[in-house]
């Protein structure tokens, strides 16, 4: 802009090819088997909520009971959890768009209301070892793999549960703009780029 350099040194450079992981999505039958097995393992509420919202793993595990209004079904997503050298850290989500309010289906709110009676922690999904801290991302990842294997489902990453939610939402007629807001994407273009 100030013409300090006569030519752009980046002109002619080739960008590396986009390397994206193959997106995996659970089919409807797999989803049913998965949720039945998750219930048997004591993780039904965690995985049901994720499959109904498409939350990122760190967002899901950072949820506290104060984030859910049982009267309206409004769930506030305003923090995330991640691990640094074995220590859990809580921070704000990755973008401003990631801070959002979702309205849960009444059936999910009722499942969470009943589950709440069994949990003695401010965290929605506390550690099974220490109730005053949330369950760790690594523990949930390992549990996911166990449940998938026992349910006879294909092996997927936790993030693929988010893809499953998005794919099923689009198949059921949700518009891209609404889905984009639910997923916490900065723009609908991001959602379109991933899911079309």
Q: Model-predicted segments: where are they?
A:
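Basic, Lys/Arg- and aromatic-enriched nucleic-acid-binding interface segment
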Residues: 5-65, 70-71, 82, 97-99, ...
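C-terminal catalytic core of tyrosine-transesterase DNA break-rejoin enzymes
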Residues: 44, 48, 52-59, 138-146, ...
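Catalytic-site neighborhood detector that most strongly recognizes the C-terminal catalytic loop/helix
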Residues: 17, 25, 81, 183-196
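N-terminal core-binding DNA-recognition domain of tyrosine site-specific recombinases/integrases
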Residues: 1-9, 20, 131-139, 152-160
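Active-site/catalytic core of tyrosine-dependent DNA strand-transfer enzymes
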Residues: 25-29, 72, 79-86, 105-154
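Short, P/G- and charge-enriched loop/turn segments at secondary-structure junctions
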Residues: 88-93
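A short, basic/aromatic helix-end/turn motif that makes direct DNA contacts
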Residues: 62-68, 180-186, 196
